[in-house]
Amino acid sequence: VKMTWILGFLLLSIALGLPDLAIGQQIASGSEADVDVTPDVVYGRKDGMALTFDVFRPSNAHGGAVLYMVSGGWVSRWTPPEWLIAWSFGGLLEKGLTVLAVRHGSAPRYKVPEAEADVRRALRYIRLHSEELGIDEDRLGVFGGSAGGHLSLMLGLGSDDGVMGSNDEILRTAARVAAVVAYYPPVDLRAIVGPSERFPALDFAEEKAASISPILFASPDDPPTLLIHGDADMLVNMENSKVMFEALQGEGVESELIIIPGGDHGFRLPADRERAQQAMVEWFDRHLRR
């Protein structure tokens, strides 16, 4: 499918009545590059269901790519591709970055450890098939917000060289990225694991929490990591990003923490969204452009 991403934004704005989206300002002043969209690429299956991602490749693609974690409360919903272009990806596409929107098995059926395993498999698949996807496996970034930010940090900080001896070619492939951006991420699941009506994905065995808590994975070989958090976030306290930043700094990792004054969870104010989006795009452009 080929479409002009400005048109996608206009359709979204009309449908939702959102003319002041921060990304819309970027589109209005940007080029009219075409985007090739390949939806529903299958990277695995579980319980008879396909695990998929969508590929958004701009006409000015240079090989760098960003995996977007489609996750809120560790629920991964399908969204029309043209909406994603307008809502989240315009600035990245304008910079020549290919974007891959990765979905995982969702709560309440699947819990956080399973969601993390899904997106890790997606990363391995993407690296294994990087040539046919038209991207450079050594110039991959990952980003997301909230639960998606948590998963992004796990992929970035919990990298591995693959499961040696596995019969699965995908599992034998390394899971590594070159840059991370996380908006308002929970970083220590040990404190919040257990039965939860609002977040059923957290209802899993307590002893597994440490293995999916990014705060425990900071190490000197971690990729450049940008954290963005609002100081008025009432859902995921800003301390999450602060302690994560301190841990990364302590290991000598290139990292930055942006605190948005008055920013809430989700950056609902257009100015907050614009600041976060601009910082995210600049971070990936700096670290993924050859």
Model features per residue range: what roles?
Residues 166-167, 203-217, 222-223:
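Active-site nucleophile elbow and catalytic-triad environment of alpha/beta-hydrolase enzymes
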Residues 26-61:
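N-terminal cap/lid segment of alpha/beta-hydrolase-fold proteins
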Residues 121-194, 209:
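Primarily recognizes the serine-hydrolase "nucleophile elbow" in alpha/beta-hydrolase
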